[in-house]
Amino acid sequence: MLTTLNSPEGAVFYFEKGVYGYTCKNLDVPESATTLTFIDESHTYSGSGYLLKNVMKQFPNIKTIVINAGVQSIEIYNSMFPNIEKVISYSRNFKSGPMLISKETGILLNSFYHDKDFVIDMENIELVRSYAFEGCLSEHIKNIPEQIIAQGNSFAGSALEFGRKQFVNGVFLIGKTVVGVDRTADMAVIPDDATGVYIKNADDIEEVVFSNPDQLNKLKGTSFNTLVINNRLNLSVNDLLDYLSDIYAKAYRIAKNSDRFCTVDGVVYTKDKKVLIKYPNRRDGHYDVPEGTEYILYNAFAGSKIESVKFPESLFRIGTYAFSDCRQLTDIKFNHTIDDYSRFGDMGQFYGCRGLKELEIPSWIKVLSSMMFSCCNLKKVVLHEGLEIIGDTTFNDIAADTLTVPRTLKTVKANNFGRFIKELHVYDRAPEGILLSVLNAYNDTSTYNKIGLTFKLIVTEDDKDYTFYFPKTLPKEVISQLDECFRMFSPKAADIDWIDSLYALCFSNALVQDTAFELYDITKKDIYRNALKRSRQSIVKRYFNEGKEEKLVKFFQLGFFAKSSLEKFLKLAHENNMNALAAYILTEIEKKAPKNASKKLQL
Protein backbone atom coordinates (compact mmCIF):
# COMPACT_ATOMS: atom_id res chain seq x y z
CA MET A 1 0.00 0.00 0.00
CA LEU A 2 1.35 3.43 -1.02
CA THR A 3 0.83 6.38 1.34
CA THR A 4 1.81 10.01 0.74
CA LEU A 5 2.87 12.41 3.48
CA ASN A 6 3.89 16.05 3.31
CA SER A 7 6.85 17.77 4.96
CA PRO A 8 6.52 21.28 6.44
CA GLU A 9 8.15 22.67 3.27
CA GLY A 10 5.56 21.05 1.02
CA ALA A 11 7.67 18.09 -0.09
CA VAL A 12 5.73 14.90 -0.80
CA PHE A 13 7.09 11.57 0.48
CA TYR A 14 5.73 8.30 -0.90
CA PHE A 15 5.75 5.58 1.78
CA GLU A 16 5.27 1.85 1.38
CA LYS A 17 4.28 -0.37 4.27
CA GLY A 18 6.61 -3.31 4.84
CA VAL A 19 7.25 -5.96 7.47
CA TYR A 20 9.32 -3.61 9.63
CA GLY A 21 7.34 -0.40 9.22
CA TYR A 22 7.05 2.31 6.60
CA THR A 23 9.73 3.09 4.04
CA CYS A 24 9.91 6.07 1.72
CA LYS A 25 11.05 5.11 -1.79
CA ASN A 26 10.23 8.28 -3.72
CA LEU A 27 9.75 11.98 -3.16
CA ASP A 28 8.90 15.28 -4.83
CA VAL A 29 10.25 18.61 -3.58
CA PRO A 30 8.95 22.06 -4.60
CA GLU A 31 11.53 24.24 -6.36
CA SER A 32 11.01 27.02 -3.84
CA ALA A 33 12.17 24.88 -0.91
CA THR A 34 15.71 25.37 0.43
CA THR A 35 15.22 23.11 3.45
CA LEU A 36 13.95 19.54 3.47
CA THR A 37 12.66 17.81 6.60
CA PHE A 38 12.75 14.05 6.83
CA ILE A 39 9.56 13.48 8.83
CA ASP A 40 8.91 10.95 11.60
CA GLU A 41 6.27 9.78 14.07
CA SER A 42 4.89 13.26 14.65
CA HIS A 43 3.57 12.82 11.12
CA THR A 44 1.99 9.46 11.94
CA TYR A 45 4.65 6.87 11.15
CA SER A 46 7.18 5.76 13.74
CA GLY A 47 10.52 4.38 12.71
CA SER A 48 10.55 5.89 9.24
CA GLY A 49 13.21 4.84 6.75
CA TYR A 50 14.24 6.56 3.53
CA LEU A 51 15.61 4.35 0.72
CA LEU A 52 16.12 6.82 -2.10
CA LYS A 53 19.19 5.61 -4.00
CA ASN A 54 17.04 4.36 -6.86
CA VAL A 55 15.33 7.73 -7.30
CA MET A 56 16.80 9.51 -10.33
CA LYS A 57 15.89 13.04 -9.23
CA GLN A 58 17.95 16.06 -8.22
CA PHE A 59 17.04 18.93 -5.91
CA PRO A 60 19.76 21.58 -6.26
CA ASN A 61 17.97 24.25 -4.20
CA ILE A 62 18.04 22.24 -0.97
CA LYS A 63 20.83 23.51 1.28
CA THR A 64 19.71 22.19 4.65
CA ILE A 65 18.48 18.75 5.66
CA VAL A 66 16.47 18.44 8.89
CA ILE A 67 16.10 14.96 10.40
CA ASN A 68 13.28 14.45 12.88
CA ALA A 69 13.65 12.26 15.97
CA GLY A 70 11.99 9.09 14.72
CA VAL A 71 13.94 8.71 11.49
CA GLN A 72 15.82 5.42 11.52
CA SER A 73 17.69 5.34 8.21
CA ILE A 74 18.52 7.52 5.21
CA GLU A 75 20.09 6.18 2.03
CA ILE A 76 20.76 8.79 -0.65
CA TYR A 77 23.43 9.66 -3.18
CA ASN A 78 25.24 12.99 -2.95
CA SER A 79 23.97 13.85 -6.43
CA MET A 80 20.36 14.06 -5.20
CA PHE A 81 21.21 17.11 -3.08
CA PRO A 82 24.32 18.66 -4.70
CA ASN A 83 24.32 21.89 -2.66
CA ILE A 84 23.85 20.70 0.91
CA GLU A 85 25.61 22.91 3.45
CA LYS A 86 24.44 21.40 6.72
CA VAL A 87 22.50 18.65 8.43
CA ILE A 88 20.33 19.42 11.47
CA SER A 89 19.47 16.23 13.32
CA TYR A 90 16.98 15.66 16.13
CA SER A 91 17.44 11.92 15.75
CA ARG A 92 19.71 9.88 17.98
CA ASN A 93 20.74 8.03 14.84
CA PHE A 94 22.44 10.93 13.06
CA LYS A 95 24.85 13.74 13.86
CA SER A 96 24.31 17.38 13.06
CA GLY A 97 27.00 18.97 10.92
CA PRO A 98 28.12 19.45 7.32
CA MET A 99 28.00 15.73 6.47
CA LEU A 100 25.51 12.90 7.00
CA ILE A 101 27.01 10.67 9.71
CA SER A 102 25.50 7.82 11.68
CA LYS A 103 25.98 8.80 15.30
CA GLU A 104 25.98 5.42 17.06
CA THR A 105 27.90 3.39 14.49
CA GLY A 106 30.38 6.01 13.28
CA ILE A 107 29.49 5.52 9.62
CA LEU A 108 30.10 8.35 7.17
CA LEU A 109 27.13 8.10 4.82
CA ASN A 110 27.43 11.25 2.70
CA SER A 111 30.10 13.95 2.49
CA PHE A 112 28.00 15.92 -0.05
CA TYR A 113 29.39 18.17 -2.79
CA HIS A 114 31.52 20.42 -0.60
CA ASP A 115 34.04 22.70 -2.32
CA LYS A 116 37.84 22.44 -2.33
CA ASP A 117 38.24 24.61 0.80
CA PHE A 118 36.03 22.41 2.96
CA VAL A 119 37.84 20.47 5.72
CA ILE A 120 36.70 16.86 6.10
CA ASP A 121 36.62 15.97 9.80
CA MET A 122 37.04 12.19 10.23
CA GLU A 123 36.89 12.17 14.04
CA ASN A 124 35.16 9.02 15.36
CA ILE A 125 34.52 7.76 11.83
CA GLU A 126 34.91 3.97 11.71
CA LEU A 127 33.46 3.16 8.31
CA VAL A 128 32.95 5.03 5.03
CA ARG A 129 30.00 3.91 2.92
CA SER A 130 30.22 3.24 -0.82
CA TYR A 131 30.21 6.48 -2.85
CA ALA A 132 30.14 8.57 0.33
CA PHE A 133 32.62 11.07 -1.19
CA GLU A 134 31.28 11.12 -4.74
CA GLY A 135 31.40 14.69 -6.08
CA CYS A 136 33.23 16.09 -3.04
CA LEU A 137 35.92 18.55 -4.21
CA SER A 138 37.87 18.80 -0.96
CA GLU A 139 41.22 17.09 -0.39
CA HIS A 140 41.67 18.42 3.16
CA ILE A 141 41.21 15.83 5.93
CA LYS A 142 41.74 16.14 9.68
CA ASN A 143 41.45 13.84 12.70
CA ILE A 144 42.31 10.80 10.62
CA PRO A 145 41.87 7.53 12.59
CA GLU A 146 44.58 4.88 12.38
CA GLN A 147 42.09 2.25 11.32
CA ILE A 148 39.04 2.75 9.16
CA ILE A 149 36.90 0.52 6.98
CA ALA A 150 36.13 1.78 3.49
CA GLN A 151 33.46 0.02 1.50
CA GLY A 152 33.94 -0.45 -2.23
CA ASN A 153 34.15 2.83 -4.19
CA SER A 154 33.90 4.95 -1.05
CA PHE A 155 35.98 7.71 -2.68
CA ALA A 156 34.90 7.14 -6.28
CA GLY A 157 34.26 10.34 -8.22
CA SER A 158 35.85 12.59 -5.60
CA ALA A 159 38.87 14.89 -5.56
CA LEU A 160 40.47 12.47 -3.11
CA GLU A 161 40.35 9.77 -5.79
CA PHE A 162 41.72 11.94 -8.59
CA GLY A 163 43.93 14.37 -6.70
CA ARG A 164 47.63 13.51 -6.64
CA LYS A 165 48.79 15.02 -3.37
CA GLN A 166 47.13 12.32 -1.27
CA PHE A 167 49.06 9.49 -2.92
CA VAL A 168 52.27 7.96 -1.61
CA ASN A 169 53.86 5.28 -3.80
CA GLY A 170 50.65 5.13 -5.76
CA VAL A 171 48.30 4.55 -2.82
CA PHE A 172 45.93 6.79 -0.89
CA LEU A 173 46.04 6.29 2.86
CA ILE A 174 43.67 7.42 5.56
CA GLY A 175 45.62 6.75 8.71
CA LYS A 176 47.00 3.28 8.11
CA THR A 177 44.19 2.22 5.83
CA VAL A 178 44.61 2.04 2.06
CA VAL A 179 41.40 3.36 0.55
CA GLY A 180 42.46 4.01 -3.04
CA VAL A 181 45.14 3.81 -5.70
CA ASP A 182 46.54 6.34 -8.14
CA ARG A 183 45.07 5.19 -11.44
CA THR A 184 47.64 7.25 -13.36
CA ALA A 185 50.58 5.41 -11.77
CA ASP A 186 52.36 2.38 -13.22
CA MET A 187 52.81 0.81 -9.80
CA ALA A 188 51.13 0.98 -6.41
CA VAL A 189 53.02 -0.26 -3.34
CA ILE A 190 50.93 -1.24 -0.32
CA PRO A 191 52.75 -0.37 2.95
CA ASP A 192 53.66 -3.33 5.18
CA ASP A 193 51.98 -1.75 8.19
CA ALA A 194 48.69 -0.92 6.46
CA THR A 195 45.98 -2.22 8.76
CA GLY A 196 43.35 -2.30 6.05
CA VAL A 197 43.28 -2.40 2.27
CA TYR A 198 40.09 -1.45 0.45
CA ILE A 199 40.57 -1.51 -3.31
CA LYS A 200 37.80 -2.71 -5.58
CA ASN A 201 39.46 -2.20 -8.94
CA ALA A 202 43.11 -1.68 -9.85
CA ASP A 203 42.81 -2.46 -13.57
CA ASP A 204 44.42 0.81 -14.61
CA ILE A 205 47.69 0.08 -12.80
CA GLU A 206 50.23 -2.30 -14.26
CA GLU A 207 51.40 -3.68 -10.90
CA VAL A 208 50.14 -3.60 -7.32
CA VAL A 209 52.82 -4.72 -4.86
CA PHE A 210 52.20 -6.34 -1.46
CA SER A 211 54.78 -7.39 1.07
CA ASN A 212 52.35 -8.50 3.76
CA PRO A 213 50.29 -11.47 2.48
CA ASP A 214 47.75 -11.08 5.31
CA GLN A 215 46.53 -7.95 3.53
CA LEU A 216 45.33 -10.08 0.63
CA ASN A 217 42.39 -11.27 2.73
CA LYS A 218 40.92 -7.78 2.32
CA LEU A 219 40.98 -8.02 -1.49
CA LYS A 220 38.36 -10.65 -2.26
CA GLY A 221 36.65 -9.60 -5.49
CA THR A 222 39.33 -7.07 -6.45
CA SER A 223 40.66 -6.88 -10.02
CA PHE A 224 44.35 -6.45 -10.89
CA ASN A 225 46.59 -6.61 -13.91
CA THR A 226 49.67 -7.98 -12.14
CA LEU A 227 49.55 -8.77 -8.43
CA VAL A 228 53.06 -8.74 -6.98
CA ILE A 229 53.80 -10.43 -3.65
CA ASN A 230 57.19 -9.15 -2.52
CA ASN A 231 57.59 -11.62 0.30
CA ARG A 232 59.42 -14.90 0.86
CA LEU A 233 56.05 -16.43 1.71
CA ASN A 234 56.79 -19.05 4.33
CA LEU A 235 53.25 -20.32 3.94
CA SER A 236 51.67 -23.66 3.20
CA VAL A 237 50.42 -24.28 -0.32
CA ASN A 238 46.84 -24.32 0.96
CA ASP A 239 47.27 -20.98 2.75
CA LEU A 240 48.67 -19.32 -0.36
CA LEU A 241 45.84 -20.66 -2.50
CA ASP A 242 43.36 -19.37 0.06
CA TYR A 243 44.97 -15.91 -0.06
CA LEU A 244 44.72 -15.80 -3.85
CA SER A 245 41.21 -17.20 -4.19
CA ASP A 246 38.59 -14.70 -5.39
CA ILE A 247 41.27 -12.18 -6.36
CA TYR A 248 40.98 -11.40 -10.06
CA ALA A 249 44.34 -10.95 -11.77
CA LYS A 250 45.86 -11.32 -15.22
CA ALA A 251 49.21 -12.32 -13.75
CA TYR A 252 50.98 -12.99 -10.46
CA ARG A 253 54.57 -12.31 -9.52
CA ILE A 254 56.22 -13.68 -6.37
CA ALA A 255 59.54 -12.49 -4.97
CA LYS A 256 62.51 -14.39 -6.38
CA ASN A 257 63.94 -14.95 -2.90
CA SER A 258 60.97 -17.11 -1.89
CA ASP A 259 62.16 -20.59 -0.93
CA ARG A 260 58.74 -22.16 -1.51
CA PHE A 261 57.05 -20.51 -4.46
CA CYS A 262 57.72 -18.97 -7.84
CA THR A 263 55.85 -17.66 -10.85
CA VAL A 264 56.22 -18.84 -14.43
CA ASP A 265 54.68 -16.49 -17.00
CA GLY A 266 52.40 -15.10 -14.31
CA VAL A 267 51.25 -18.50 -12.99
CA VAL A 268 52.03 -19.53 -9.40
CA TYR A 269 54.02 -22.74 -8.84
CA THR A 270 55.95 -24.38 -6.06
CA LYS A 271 59.64 -23.47 -6.19
CA ASP A 272 60.54 -26.72 -7.98
CA LYS A 273 57.82 -25.98 -10.57
CA LYS A 274 56.21 -29.36 -10.02
CA VAL A 275 52.92 -28.15 -8.52
CA LEU A 276 50.75 -25.58 -10.31
CA ILE A 277 49.05 -23.65 -7.50
CA LYS A 278 47.14 -20.79 -9.11
CA TYR A 279 46.40 -19.66 -12.63
CA PRO A 280 45.41 -15.97 -12.98
CA ASN A 281 41.68 -16.09 -13.43
CA ARG A 282 41.40 -12.97 -15.60
CA ARG A 283 43.70 -14.41 -18.26
CA ASP A 284 41.94 -15.82 -21.30
CA GLY A 285 43.15 -17.81 -24.31
CA HIS A 286 45.12 -21.06 -24.49
CA TYR A 287 47.53 -22.42 -21.88
CA ASP A 288 50.13 -25.13 -22.34
CA VAL A 289 50.87 -26.48 -18.88
CA PRO A 290 54.71 -26.69 -18.93
CA GLU A 291 56.48 -30.03 -19.13
CA GLY A 292 57.76 -30.91 -15.65
CA THR A 293 54.48 -30.01 -13.95
CA GLU A 294 53.30 -33.04 -11.98
CA TYR A 295 50.23 -31.85 -10.08
CA ILE A 296 47.59 -29.19 -10.71
CA LEU A 297 46.29 -28.18 -7.29
CA TYR A 298 42.61 -28.17 -6.40
CA ASN A 299 40.83 -24.99 -7.57
CA ALA A 300 43.99 -23.88 -9.39
CA PHE A 301 42.09 -22.66 -12.48
CA ALA A 302 38.67 -22.31 -10.83
CA GLY A 303 36.57 -19.52 -12.32
CA SER A 304 39.26 -18.44 -14.77
CA LYS A 305 38.70 -17.27 -18.34
CA ILE A 306 40.94 -19.92 -19.89
CA GLU A 307 39.61 -21.12 -23.26
CA SER A 308 41.74 -24.21 -23.97
CA VAL A 309 44.40 -26.23 -22.16
CA LYS A 310 47.00 -28.87 -22.99
CA PHE A 311 48.45 -31.19 -20.34
CA PRO A 312 52.09 -32.37 -20.40
CA GLU A 313 53.09 -36.02 -20.10
CA SER A 314 54.77 -35.23 -16.76
CA LEU A 315 51.37 -34.45 -15.19
CA PHE A 316 50.02 -37.32 -13.09
CA ARG A 317 47.30 -35.61 -11.02
CA ILE A 318 44.60 -32.95 -11.48
CA GLY A 319 43.04 -31.92 -8.18
CA THR A 320 39.43 -31.55 -7.13
CA TYR A 321 37.57 -28.73 -8.92
CA ALA A 322 40.85 -27.67 -10.54
CA PHE A 323 39.04 -26.21 -13.58
CA SER A 324 35.60 -25.74 -12.04
CA ASP A 325 33.43 -22.96 -13.47
CA CYS A 326 35.86 -22.17 -16.31
CA ARG A 327 32.92 -21.15 -18.46
CA GLN A 328 34.97 -20.18 -21.50
CA LEU A 329 36.86 -23.49 -21.63
CA THR A 330 36.00 -25.24 -24.91
CA ASP A 331 38.90 -27.61 -25.58
CA ILE A 332 40.95 -30.02 -23.44
CA LYS A 333 44.04 -31.86 -24.68
CA PHE A 334 44.47 -34.81 -22.29
CA ASN A 335 47.88 -36.35 -21.71
CA HIS A 336 48.63 -40.08 -21.86
CA THR A 337 49.88 -40.30 -18.27
CA ILE A 338 46.65 -40.00 -16.33
CA ASP A 339 44.37 -43.00 -16.84
CA ASP A 340 42.42 -42.80 -13.56
CA TYR A 341 41.12 -39.35 -12.58
CA SER A 342 39.81 -40.61 -9.24
CA ARG A 343 43.05 -42.27 -8.11
CA PHE A 344 43.81 -39.74 -5.35
CA GLY A 345 40.19 -39.17 -4.37
CA ASP A 346 39.90 -36.12 -6.61
CA MET A 347 36.62 -35.22 -8.30
CA GLY A 348 34.83 -32.49 -10.23
CA GLN A 349 37.95 -31.45 -12.15
CA PHE A 350 35.91 -29.74 -14.92
CA TYR A 351 32.69 -29.12 -13.02
CA GLY A 352 30.59 -26.28 -14.43
CA CYS A 353 32.66 -25.71 -17.60
CA ARG A 354 29.64 -24.65 -19.59
CA GLY A 355 31.66 -23.79 -22.68
CA LEU A 356 32.28 -27.49 -23.30
CA LYS A 357 29.87 -28.52 -26.06
CA GLU A 358 31.58 -31.67 -27.35
CA LEU A 359 33.95 -34.03 -25.59
CA GLU A 360 35.99 -37.03 -26.68
CA ILE A 361 37.40 -39.30 -23.98
CA PRO A 362 40.64 -40.89 -25.30
CA SER A 363 41.13 -44.66 -25.30
CA TRP A 364 43.84 -44.64 -22.62
CA ILE A 365 41.58 -43.14 -19.94
CA LYS A 366 40.09 -45.93 -17.80
CA VAL A 367 38.34 -44.08 -14.96
CA LEU A 368 36.48 -40.76 -14.93
CA SER A 369 36.02 -39.22 -11.48
CA SER A 370 32.78 -38.24 -9.80
CA MET A 371 31.31 -34.96 -11.10
CA MET A 372 34.25 -34.62 -13.49
CA PHE A 373 32.08 -33.04 -16.22
CA SER A 374 28.98 -32.31 -14.18
CA CYS A 375 26.97 -29.16 -14.95
CA CYS A 376 28.71 -28.63 -18.26
CA ASN A 377 26.81 -27.87 -21.45
CA LEU A 378 27.68 -31.03 -23.33
CA LYS A 379 25.72 -31.90 -26.44
CA LYS A 380 27.92 -34.74 -27.66
CA VAL A 381 30.20 -37.21 -25.85
CA VAL A 382 32.37 -39.82 -27.55
CA LEU A 383 33.56 -42.67 -25.30
CA HIS A 384 36.33 -44.83 -26.74
CA GLU A 385 37.22 -48.44 -26.02
CA GLY A 386 39.39 -48.56 -22.91
CA LEU A 387 37.07 -46.67 -20.58
CA GLU A 388 36.05 -48.90 -17.64
CA ILE A 389 34.39 -46.79 -14.92
CA ILE A 390 32.32 -43.60 -14.98
CA GLY A 391 32.00 -42.07 -11.51
CA ASP A 392 28.93 -40.69 -9.78
CA THR A 393 27.42 -37.69 -11.63
CA THR A 394 30.37 -37.49 -14.03
CA PHE A 395 27.97 -36.46 -16.81
CA ASN A 396 24.84 -35.35 -15.00
CA ASP A 397 22.90 -34.14 -18.05
CA ILE A 398 23.90 -34.34 -21.69
CA ALA A 399 21.73 -32.59 -24.25
CA ALA A 400 21.99 -35.52 -26.67
CA ASP A 401 19.38 -38.12 -27.50
CA THR A 402 21.72 -41.00 -28.46
CA LEU A 403 24.66 -42.60 -26.69
CA THR A 404 27.03 -45.44 -27.59
CA VAL A 405 29.20 -46.94 -24.85
CA PRO A 406 32.33 -49.05 -25.42
CA ARG A 407 32.63 -52.78 -24.71
CA THR A 408 35.22 -52.09 -22.02
CA LEU A 409 32.86 -49.99 -19.89
CA LYS A 410 31.89 -52.05 -16.84
CA THR A 411 30.38 -49.61 -14.35
CA VAL A 412 28.35 -46.42 -14.62
CA LYS A 413 27.63 -44.95 -11.20
CA ALA A 414 24.51 -42.97 -10.31
CA ASN A 415 23.18 -39.81 -11.97
CA ASN A 416 24.90 -39.96 -15.33
CA PHE A 417 23.95 -38.93 -18.87
CA GLY A 418 20.56 -37.73 -17.75
CA ARG A 419 17.03 -37.67 -18.93
CA PHE A 420 17.53 -36.65 -22.55
CA ILE A 421 19.09 -39.90 -23.80
CA LYS A 422 16.43 -41.73 -25.82
CA GLU A 423 18.60 -44.32 -27.54
CA LEU A 424 21.45 -46.37 -26.03
CA HIS A 425 23.78 -48.71 -27.90
CA VAL A 426 25.81 -51.26 -25.90
CA TYR A 427 27.89 -54.30 -26.81
CA ASP A 428 27.36 -57.81 -25.40
CA ARG A 429 26.33 -56.74 -21.89
CA ALA A 430 25.16 -53.40 -20.57
CA PRO A 431 27.51 -51.77 -18.02
CA GLU A 432 26.31 -51.93 -14.44
CA GLY A 433 24.16 -48.89 -13.65
CA ILE A 434 23.77 -47.59 -17.19
CA LEU A 435 19.99 -48.05 -17.35
CA LEU A 436 19.60 -46.60 -13.87
CA SER A 437 21.29 -43.48 -15.25
CA VAL A 438 19.48 -43.02 -18.55
CA LEU A 439 15.95 -44.01 -17.52
CA ASN A 440 13.77 -41.71 -15.47
CA ALA A 441 12.48 -42.86 -12.07
CA TYR A 442 10.68 -39.63 -11.12
CA ASN A 443 7.00 -38.89 -11.54
CA ASP A 444 7.44 -35.36 -12.83
CA THR A 445 4.85 -34.64 -15.51
CA SER A 446 6.53 -31.35 -16.47
CA THR A 447 9.51 -33.23 -17.91
CA TYR A 448 7.74 -35.79 -20.10
CA ASN A 449 7.57 -33.56 -23.16
CA LYS A 450 11.29 -32.85 -22.84
CA ILE A 451 12.55 -36.38 -22.23
CA GLY A 452 10.06 -38.37 -24.32
CA LEU A 453 8.00 -41.37 -23.31
CA THR A 454 9.90 -44.27 -24.84
CA PHE A 455 13.44 -45.57 -24.81
CA LYS A 456 15.35 -47.62 -27.37
CA LEU A 457 18.10 -50.05 -26.36
CA ILE A 458 20.31 -51.70 -28.96
CA VAL A 459 22.49 -54.58 -27.79
CA THR A 460 25.07 -55.89 -30.26
CA GLU A 461 26.17 -59.47 -29.67
CA ASP A 462 28.10 -61.61 -32.17
CA ASP A 463 27.70 -58.85 -34.77
CA LYS A 464 23.92 -59.01 -34.49
CA ASP A 465 21.77 -56.14 -33.20
CA TYR A 466 18.94 -56.81 -30.73
CA THR A 467 16.55 -53.90 -30.31
CA PHE A 468 14.27 -53.35 -27.32
CA TYR A 469 11.72 -50.63 -26.61
CA PHE A 470 10.32 -49.78 -23.20
CA PRO A 471 9.05 -46.75 -21.27
CA LYS A 472 11.48 -43.95 -20.52
CA THR A 473 9.85 -43.39 -17.11
CA LEU A 474 9.43 -46.34 -14.73
CA PRO A 475 9.58 -47.07 -10.99
CA LYS A 476 13.15 -47.38 -9.77
CA GLU A 477 12.82 -51.04 -8.77
CA VAL A 478 11.73 -51.89 -12.31
CA ILE A 479 14.66 -49.98 -13.79
CA SER A 480 16.96 -51.93 -11.46
CA GLN A 481 15.51 -55.17 -12.82
CA LEU A 482 16.12 -54.02 -16.39
CA ASP A 483 19.65 -52.97 -15.50
CA GLU A 484 20.37 -56.40 -14.03
CA CYS A 485 18.74 -58.23 -16.94
CA PHE A 486 20.89 -56.61 -19.62
CA ARG A 487 24.01 -56.62 -17.44
CA MET A 488 23.85 -60.30 -16.52
CA PHE A 489 22.30 -62.03 -19.51
CA SER A 490 22.52 -62.27 -23.25
CA PRO A 491 19.95 -60.19 -25.12
CA LYS A 492 18.69 -63.49 -26.53
CA ALA A 493 17.55 -64.41 -23.00
CA ALA A 494 15.51 -61.24 -22.47
CA ASP A 495 11.88 -61.79 -21.42
CA ILE A 496 10.15 -59.94 -24.26
CA ASP A 497 6.64 -60.41 -22.85
CA TRP A 498 7.71 -58.85 -19.54
CA ILE A 499 9.45 -55.96 -21.30
CA ASP A 500 6.38 -55.34 -23.48
CA SER A 501 4.17 -55.22 -20.37
CA LEU A 502 6.20 -52.54 -18.61
CA TYR A 503 4.13 -49.68 -20.07
CA ALA A 504 1.39 -50.58 -17.57
CA LEU A 505 3.73 -49.69 -14.68
CA CYS A 506 4.03 -46.01 -15.61
CA PHE A 507 3.06 -43.56 -12.89
CA SER A 508 -0.41 -42.46 -14.10
CA ASN A 509 -3.22 -43.59 -16.40
CA ALA A 510 -2.42 -40.76 -18.79
CA LEU A 511 1.24 -41.77 -18.89
CA VAL A 512 0.30 -45.44 -19.39
CA GLN A 513 -1.96 -44.50 -22.31
CA ASP A 514 0.46 -42.09 -23.98
CA THR A 515 3.37 -44.52 -23.60
CA ALA A 516 1.32 -47.35 -25.11
CA PHE A 517 0.36 -45.04 -27.98
CA GLU A 518 4.00 -44.14 -28.68
CA LEU A 519 5.18 -47.76 -28.35
CA TYR A 520 2.48 -48.96 -30.74
CA ASP A 521 3.48 -46.30 -33.26
CA ILE A 522 7.04 -47.69 -33.13
CA THR A 523 6.49 -51.45 -32.82
CA LYS A 524 2.93 -52.08 -34.08
CA LYS A 525 2.59 -54.77 -31.39
CA ASP A 526 -0.89 -56.01 -30.50
CA ILE A 527 -0.31 -55.63 -26.76
CA TYR A 528 -0.20 -51.85 -27.18
CA ARG A 529 -3.03 -51.69 -29.73
CA ASN A 530 -5.32 -53.70 -27.49
CA ALA A 531 -4.52 -51.46 -24.52
CA LEU A 532 -5.34 -48.39 -26.59
CA LYS A 533 -8.59 -49.90 -27.79
CA ARG A 534 -9.70 -50.67 -24.22
CA SER A 535 -9.02 -47.08 -23.17
CA ARG A 536 -10.17 -45.36 -26.37
CA GLN A 537 -13.02 -43.35 -24.82
CA SER A 538 -10.93 -41.92 -21.97
CA ILE A 539 -8.01 -41.20 -24.32
CA VAL A 540 -10.18 -39.22 -26.75
CA LYS A 541 -11.89 -37.35 -23.92
CA ARG A 542 -8.53 -36.38 -22.41
CA TYR A 543 -7.06 -35.27 -25.73
CA PHE A 544 -10.11 -33.06 -26.36
CA ASN A 545 -9.76 -31.53 -22.87
CA GLU A 546 -6.05 -30.94 -23.45
CA GLY A 547 -6.58 -29.49 -26.93
CA LYS A 548 -4.29 -32.04 -28.58
CA GLU A 549 -5.70 -31.97 -32.10
CA GLU A 550 -2.69 -33.58 -33.77
CA LYS A 551 -2.78 -36.53 -31.37
CA LEU A 552 -6.53 -36.92 -31.90
CA VAL A 553 -6.09 -37.18 -35.67
CA LYS A 554 -3.40 -39.79 -35.18
CA PHE A 555 -5.50 -41.73 -32.67
CA PHE A 556 -8.59 -41.80 -34.91
CA GLN A 557 -6.38 -43.26 -37.64
CA LEU A 558 -6.28 -46.46 -35.56
CA GLY A 559 -9.89 -47.10 -36.63
CA PHE A 560 -11.38 -47.88 -33.23
CA PHE A 561 -14.70 -46.03 -33.71
CA ALA A 562 -17.89 -46.77 -35.60
CA LYS A 563 -19.69 -44.22 -37.77
CA SER A 564 -22.11 -43.23 -34.99
CA SER A 565 -19.28 -42.42 -32.60
CA LEU A 566 -17.41 -40.50 -35.28
CA GLU A 567 -20.45 -38.30 -35.86
CA LYS A 568 -20.45 -37.34 -32.16
CA PHE A 569 -16.75 -36.56 -32.29
CA LEU A 570 -17.24 -34.49 -35.44
CA LYS A 571 -19.57 -32.24 -33.48
CA LEU A 572 -16.98 -31.95 -30.68
CA ALA A 573 -14.28 -31.10 -33.21
CA HIS A 574 -16.41 -28.24 -34.58
CA GLU A 575 -17.16 -26.98 -31.06
CA ASN A 576 -13.43 -26.93 -30.26
CA ASN A 577 -12.46 -25.28 -33.58
CA MET A 578 -10.35 -28.30 -34.53
CA ASN A 579 -10.71 -27.94 -38.29
CA ALA A 580 -8.05 -30.47 -39.30
CA LEU A 581 -9.63 -33.08 -37.03
CA ALA A 582 -13.12 -32.31 -38.32
CA ALA A 583 -11.95 -32.73 -41.91
CA TYR A 584 -10.36 -36.08 -41.11
CA ILE A 585 -13.43 -37.40 -39.23
CA LEU A 586 -15.73 -36.29 -42.03
CA THR A 587 -13.63 -38.20 -44.54
CA GLU A 588 -13.80 -41.32 -42.36
CA ILE A 589 -17.57 -40.99 -41.96
CA GLU A 590 -18.00 -40.75 -45.70
CA LYS A 591 -15.90 -43.89 -46.13
CA LYS A 592 -18.20 -45.75 -43.75
CA ALA A 593 -21.43 -44.48 -45.38
CA PRO A 594 -23.40 -46.87 -47.68
CA LYS A 595 -22.35 -46.63 -51.32
CA ASN A 596 -25.85 -45.67 -52.45
CA ALA A 597 -26.20 -42.88 -49.90
CA SER A 598 -27.49 -39.79 -51.66
CA LYS A 599 -26.81 -37.37 -48.91
CA LYS A 600 -23.39 -36.50 -47.59
CA LEU A 601 -22.46 -34.72 -44.45
CA GLN A 602 -21.24 -31.20 -44.98
CA LEU A 603 -18.17 -29.79 -43.29
Name each model-derived stretch.
Residues A580, L586-K595:
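Short, amphipathic alpha-helical interaction segments positioned at domain boundaries
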Residues F561-S565, K592-A597:
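Ankyrin repeat arrays, specifically the small/polar loop and inter-repeat linker segments at the C-terminal end
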Residues Q513-Y528, K551-L552:
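Repeat-mediated protein-protein interaction surfaces in helical alpha-solenoids
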Residues K551, A580-L581:
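Conserved ankyrin/ankyrin-like repeat signature
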Residues M1-S73, M80-L127, E134-G152, G157-I174, ...:
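Structural signature of tandem-repeat unit edges
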